[in-house]
Amino acid sequence: LVGITYTELGSIGSYVSASAAQEAWKAQAVAIHSYLEYHKQYGSSANALIYTPVEDIPSSARSAIRKAVESVKDEVLTYNGSVIDAVWSASAGYNTQTGVYGTCSSLDAWGSDVPYLKSVESPYERQYHEKMRRIIGKDYDYVEYNDSRTGEPYQSADTTHKDLGGFVQYNTLVSNGRSYRYIGQFVSSRYCFDFSTDATGVPCMYYYGFGHGVGMSQCGAVGYAAEEGMGYRDILKHYYSGVSIRTVGSGTSSGGGLFGWLRRLLGM
């Protein structure tokens, strides 16, 4: 799980109107609440979540977040009556075979077929990808590069070598029968490839996804809100297939973690 802070989501939302950013914040708040409730019920850890101290959030952003979160703080996502494991990532990937931006299913990412974590389209990723790209050969080390010729297209990229979290550990790129291997834990398990060389002739592979790509895309949520005026409920139901949204009693919220954070933010 890629950790999230409300200020990180806010930095993406700053490129759109305040009303659109609020719908994305609402969607994120409901997803986080659902995720924590799910892991609390099943006794697993949710330590991957990252919280920003309330006092570190600018007052203007704090006010906007407070307004967005207040109305949804008791809502969770359910599937067949049970709260869901509402995972999310910063940005969805790109399917080079279909040419469509979209999320990754839990089956493709982790080998577990979860009915509400299907692959869905997420078209508003491209505008944020430049801000999140990583360059193999600069941001990561490369090894086994034994050919100095440039200008030859890469023919394939083997991304099957992953750790237990689903993140690619290294790639083997093939060009005209020669292999180039790059190592390092990539920050995405599904992404768009763009190949080129730097000024010295070293091949660089750009990729633009960020995170595991399963569940809601934060960039996609902002895009749907800004470009289509989509509300948080429709955003959530798009990214989590077949879910319902229900209100739970305030007694379900513990005093620590996200809920303590929200109480301090909301002045409760």
Question: What residue ranges belong to the model's regions?
Answer:
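Conserved, single-site charged/polar hotspot
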Residues: L1-M268
